[in-house]
C-alpha cells in the first residue's frame, strides 16, 4: 500500500530526531526511485488497478504557469470543459514526465487536471523535463479557447491580458 510507504517516509522519525536530514533525504530518494520502478514495471505484471491509479497520482508533477485559470479559462472551472493542451516546442523529444498545470495567481487555486489525449481523458499530461534546458521557459499551448473566454474571465487580477499567438 503506497499510503503506508508515504507515512513511513514522511512520518515522525524525522520529526522526533531519530533520523537526520541526510538520512531523510536518502529515504525519500529511495521512496521515489521505488515508486518509479513499480510504475515502469506495471505493464509486465498483473496489478490492482486502484493501486496503480494511486501510484500515478503520487508520481504526477505540478508545473506552475504564469497565467490565471479563472481569468483565461473560465469554462474549465465553470462547466468542466476540457481544452487541448500540449507543448509547443521540443516536439521531436518524447515527454518523460506526467504533470498537472497550476496557475500562479494570488491564491494559486487554478489547476488543469483533465487532459484530452489520443486514448481518452487523462488526469495528467505527458510533458518534458523542464530542467534539461536551464534558463529557457517551457512553452505550452492551450487550444480552442475562443475569444469569449477572455471576456468572461475579465481582468480581475494583476496578470493583465492573456498572450495570444496566431499560427498560420
What annotation goes with each model-predicted range?
Residues 1-168:
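Charged (often Lys/Glu-rich) extended helix/loop segments that serve as interaction or gating elements
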